[in-house]
A protein has these predicted regions:
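Intrinsically disordered, low-complexity terminal regions
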Residues: 1-319
Length: 319
């Protein structure tokens, strides 16, 4: 009989250690399967005019990019969740059924992509469309990337990031949680996120309305009316005022950058913070500047569109 306590301890730990290793290996295999497509499909549709694209998914990423005229191409990647290991034959049959009969429909120049109503199965879509395409998407969870289309875009997600670039139509975006990024946008934009940052770069004219419950807002190249609201977070707005601007944040700093010759009606206030206006503008303010430096009301260079800024707790800087 082995009387060595350390030997008895090592021997008794072997089954537990083996079980732990097995669980780790099973978990690693599950992650590998979940991140690897279990199936794919591709379909091509011929169209003759401006396209209407509608995509609805329970979960999965959506990517839409512009391509040749007259053709819509759809590529799907099918993913299976952690139940793949415990129902392999049934899951394989479901994946095969989707590959053979994906949820795609064409009605004239309208392409519809419907939800896959199967538990723990999701599809990522990569879609190529003509530039003249209106896009409407709705996903429960998943990232969305939309690039290079000229039509209107109405994009919704329960959770996930949105990345937009080179769009020229009327854009409406909303995600429950996730970041929004828009670059080279030429047109009006309305929307926001419940939790996440919003970043927009405008290259054309259009009214912009952005909001976030928790996160920062950065909008550059503005040329129209602007409304920005954050529950908690900083807001930066840069551009040319061709209409009223209204900016509010409950907790955060606000920075506004306008052309040096801008004329506007100033209505600025902070409950707990400081106001700062660059010297060239300060010298031309007509009105009253409260001694407490908590609010400014008056005309800048004779007045113009209203610039209204309020922050509950944070500083305001106008340059």
């Amino acid at each position: 009989m082995n009387s060595n306590p350390s030997s008895r301890f090592s021997s008794s730990c072997l089954p537990a250690r083996s079980s732990a290793i097995a669980l780790i290996m099973l978990f690693a295999c599950t992650l590998a399967l979940a991140s690897t497509p279990q199936g794919t499909f591709e379909r091509t549709f011929q169209v003759s005019g401006p396209v209407n694209l509608e995509v609805q998914t329970r979960s999965g990423d959506i990517t839409v990019r512009s391509g040749p005229a007259g053709t819509v191409s759809v590529r799907g990647k099918i993913f299976v969740g952690d139940h793949w290991l415990f129902g392999g034959d049934r899951r394989a049959g479901e994946v095969h059924a989707i590959e053979q009969n994906p949820p795609l429909r064409q009605q004239g120049d309208s392409i519809h992509i419907d939800d896959v109503n199967l538990h723990n199965i999701s599809v990522d879509y990569e879609i190529t469309v003509p530039a003249e395409t209106a896009v409407r998407t709705h996903t429960g969870s998943g990232d969305q990337t939309i690039e290079g289309v000229d039509g209107n875009a109405d994009l919704q997600s329960g959770s996930g990031d949105m990345r937009l670039s080179r769009l020229t139509g009327d854009i409406r975006i909303q995600t429950g949680s996730g970041n929004l990024r828009g670059h080279e946008i030429s047109g009006p934009v309305h929307g926001g996120t419940g939790s996440g940052d919003v970043e927009l770069e405008e290259t054309g004219s259009g009214d912009v309305d952005l909001h976030t419950g928790s996160g920062n807002i950065t909008a550059r190249g503005l040329n129209g009316t602007f409304r920005g609201e954050a529950g908690s977070g900083d807001i930066t707005a840069e551009g040319t005022q061709t209409g009223s601007w209204e900016i509010r944040t409950g907790s955060g700093n606000v920075r506004v950058r306008l052309p040096s010759n801008s004329a506007f009606e100033a209505d600025l206030s902070t409950s707990s913070g400081t106001l700062d206006i660059d010297a060239p503008i300060t010298m031309t303010v007509q009105g009253r500047v409260q001694e407490s430096r908590k609010s400014i009301h008056g005309q800048v260079r004779g007045g113009g569109p209203v610039l209204k800024v309020h922050t509950g707790s944070g500083d305001i800087h106008i340059e």
